[in-house]
Amino acid sequence: MGRSELTIYIVEDSPAVRERLIEAVVDIPNARVVGSADAVGDALEGMRAARPRVLILDVQLRGGSGFRLLKLMRTSGLSRPEAVIVVTNYPTEDYRNASRECGADHFFDKASEFHKVREVLLAL
């Protein structure tokens, strides 16, 4: 029996980084990006429709933050993805702790740990 499809939703305000994330998963067996957004409201709507297994999100978003999105997912009754991966250009300890408190499983620095996103996805 094969692995079930690894559906991924990406929330990132930078088109270049969003494209880089899509490119990082394109050749992973059974992985498919089912949607993307650059703002909290659009992400909530898209996640509700797509029900992905994995959420990859940035901290800084258009009109809000990744932390706000995670909190809204919880309070709106949206089921939590199997894995939540936060990627940021601001890898401060405060952001790392806030990510953990909001339910993120992984926290990576875009500049030095981008490859770890792919490693996590391959392990799922």
Predicted region positions:
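Acidic, metal-coordinating helix/loop segments flanking the phosphotransfer/catalytic sites
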Residues: S36-V54
